[in-house]
Amino acid sequence: MFRGAKSGQARRCPVSGRRVVYTGSRSRSPSGEEAVDIDIDLVTRARAGDSSAFAELVEQHRRELEVHCYRLLGSAQDAEDAVQETFLAAWQHMPAFEVRASVRTWLYRIATNWCLGALRSARRRPPREVFVPKPPSPAPTSPSEVIWLEPYPDVLLDGLPDEMPGPAARYQAREAISLAFVTALQLLPPRQRVVLVLRDVLGYRAREVASMLDTTEESVTSALRHARANLRHRLPRPADPPPAPGSLAEQAIVERLTMAYETGDVNALVSLLSEDVTISAPLAAGQYAGTAVARPFLETAVFPPGRTYRLIPTRANGQPAFGVYVRDPATGVFHVNGMLVLTLAGDRIRAMTRFDNTSIARFGLPRRLSPGPSAHQEV
């Protein structure tokens, strides 16, 4: 036990296993929020150094904190790391935690400020691979901007607690995890990004956000105004909304896309695309906008002669997604070739985003498939 821990005393974090030193500084929670997540006995034990009580106190918030950090950082791996650092800092400052404060908001405060520090220092992993299309592939219509972007598995979203956003929220939780929304967030300056997520996604009031960021309400209001204007420019709403997740309309698009991909039917694939479609890969040299450019890119870079694909459906960011596999002509084995995430608008595909192989394990997908045709390929 570490009852009455003093400044300079070392404690081992029960979540990460790392040793930390209590500095005596106070990590305050936003003032004025109703503390609805309090278990006073649990908090008291955690403050006294009870590691199992601390783990029980914070682990219930892990999933939602990871989603929060993912929105801010754009990388699922970086989000996991951020939450580990959050729990480490929380354990370090637990003796100074106010017993009747909100544990959830306190953790959000720590996580948000850790992410803000990471964004300001531009700590980004270098690209693991860079795909540069070779001639005769067409030139990209614009460069890639968010090379660190990663997809987020829907299975992790299903584990989120049933928390309603605050009264100031403008976005539904699922809307605020879409690939387009997360991409647009990455293009905002760090403080604008953080303020917009806290205010418009999580629904914290301006005074609460000001307390979390150690700033003024006026500064928060100004940052939010600029963030909303920038987001409107970066994230125009499509004329047609996407079909409901799991609906027959969505399933029909997924089935037709799978058949076109596995049979190498470029014409059938292009018929599914909207006129303003965007095909991109965060680590690629650029993105391809419009069917006039998308068709030759698909014909030359994606479906060259002799290449055969197999797709395994999954879901990412609340959207249809696939593990993509390419057949080895020598063995017939299908090897993983990245992930594909679809953005739908009405009955058309508005964006196709390809990610590298590093996300496969997080989605529980295999790295190879046995030889043999799929249901859409001839025997």
Predicted regions span which residues?
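A short, charge-rich alpha-helical start-of-domain segment used by transcription regulators
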Residues: 44-67, 77, 91
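Low-complexity, glycine/alanine/valine/leucine- and proline-rich hydrophobic stretches
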Residues: 295-379
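Sigma70-family region 2
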Residues: 47-48, 72-76, 85-103, 117-126, ...
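Helix-turn-helix DNA-binding module
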Residues: 186, 190-194, 198-219
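Hydrophobic-face residues of short alpha-helical interaction/recognition segments
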Residues: 65, 69, 94, 107, ...
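Solvent-exposed, charged amphipathic helical/linker segments at domain boundaries
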Residues: 206-212, 217-310
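Short, basic/polar amphipathic helix motif occurring as a linker/hinge flanking DNA-binding modules
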Residues: 108, 118-151, 234-246
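Amphipathic alpha-helical segment used for protein-protein interaction
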Residues: 37, 48-51, 148-192, 247-251, ...
